[in-house]
């Protein structure tokens, strides 16, 4: 099994998969009579159908045992999905390009610094949320509407990957 190398999360490196949601280096302007900086349009919510709605949820995630064998990835073909850490803790991101099925050799891993969120574009393969802390909270922005919006792909034993945050 191939061990994934964990990359720092940057806008440039993550661009094929979605948006990095962060204030560092992002354009902003002043509002509220000069008392507030607005970091505008850090990500775009995608929905497939006009009747779909963008919704906001909170996910409370428990850590998985590490090193982790990556056995599956999921995708949301009908909308984007954003994860913004609420407690400031670093977390891990595992992604693969849009396609009929994820290609094991194209899977990449990233580490958020805890002040960065991610917005997966429609159809991007990704592992469910991966917290490093025992328990962590995330603000999630995704889509509500009709139709199946979660496909799962399970790797064969030869395709499985290892994720080790302590490397």
From Swiss-Prot:
Top-level class of the enzyme under EC nomenclature: lyase
Alphabetized Gene3D superfamilies for the sequence: Ureidoglycolate hydrolase (2.60.120.480)
PANTHER family: UREIDOGLYCOLATE HYDROLASE, UREIDOGLYCOLATE LYASE
Stated role: Catalyzes the catabolism of the allantoin degradation intermediate (S)-ureidoglycolate, generating urea and glyoxylate. Involved in the utilization of allantoin as nitrogen source.
Family: Belongs to the ureidoglycolate lyase family.
GO biological process assignments: allantoin catabolic process; purine nucleobase catabolic process
Domain of life, per lineage: Bacteria
One term of GO molecular function: ureidoglycolate hydrolase activity
The keyword Protein transport belongs to this UniProt entry's keyword annotation: no
Cofactor: Ni(2+)
Record-linked CDD domains: cupin_UAH
Keyword Lyase among record annotations: yes
Oligomer status and interactors: Homodimer.
Pathway terms, separated by semicolons: Nitrogen metabolism; (S)-allantoin degradation
EC number: 4.3.2.3
UniProt keyword list: Lyase, Purine metabolism
InterPro entries on file: RmlC_Cupin_sf, UAH_cupin, Ureidogly_lyase, Ureidogly_lyase_bac, Ureidoglycolate_lyase_dom_sf
Name recorded for this polypeptide: Ureidoglycolate lyase
Classification via SUPFAM superfamilies: RmlC-like cupins
Substrates-to-products reaction catalysed: (S)-ureidoglycolate = urea + glyoxylate
């Amino acid at each position: 099994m191939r061990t994934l190398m964990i990359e720092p999360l940057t806008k440039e490196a993550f661009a094929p998969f979605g948006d990095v949601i962060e204030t560092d280096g992002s354009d902003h302007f002043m509002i509220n009579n000069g008392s507030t900086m607005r970091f505008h349009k850090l990500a775009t919510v995608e929905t497939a159908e006009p009747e779909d709605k963008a919704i906001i949820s909170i996910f409370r995630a428990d850590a998985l045992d590490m090193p982790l064998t990556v056995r599956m990835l999921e995708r949301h073909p009908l909308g984007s999905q954003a994860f913004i850490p609420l407690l400031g803790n670093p977390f891990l991101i595992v992604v693969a390009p849009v396609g009929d099925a994820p290609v094991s050799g194209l899977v990449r891993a990233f580490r958020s610094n805890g002040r960065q969120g991610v917005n997966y574009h429609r159809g991007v393969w990704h592992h469910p949320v991966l917290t490093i802390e025992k328990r962590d909270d995330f603000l999630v922005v995704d889509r509500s509407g009709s139709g199946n919006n979660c496909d799962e792909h399970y790797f064969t034993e030869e395709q499985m990957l290892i994720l080790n945050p302590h490397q």
